[in-house]
Amino acid sequence: KHPLLNTFYKTPAHFYEVDVKDFYLRVNPMLLLAAGSETEEGVASYYNQRGLSLRGGVGENVFFQTSFYDSQVRYPNYINQYTDSVGVVPGAALYKNFSSSLFDVAGAKDFLLATAYVGVNLGKYIGFQLGHNQFFIGEGFRSLFLSDFSTPYFSLKIKTRIWKIHYQNIFAE
């Protein structure tokens, strides 16, 4: 279990990692490849996403995270119809039609996505997070206002902890 070129994968969880006194940085590539087919119409669907994630912190109270994604997707027809009618990809916003000289990719979409935030903890009871991101509360829960269907948006999150009560304020654009 030796690091690749004495630099990469020094720890199994991170492609590249810097961990020194009062500073850490973790860099990870992201890859999502998936394929399927729509049974009624026999149309092949796929998801080809590549990206990079950076996560770090300064001291114990300042932290940041950013992710960049490049995606080529061929959705099932019912999602393509919706995407074409509203002009946006769910969760990612604007797209362009993707074409390839090697493969039949009629109806495929090409889009970029970037998210980032910076956070500060003021002691153990109050924390702030400012960025361009999506919010998810819980695992699989959706509220009237927060959804994984939305695109990333500019926001300020304030977390407060008093006794056993954890309170979040989210101010979003």
Each model region followed by its residue ranges:
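Outer-membrane beta-barrel channel domains
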Residues: 1-173
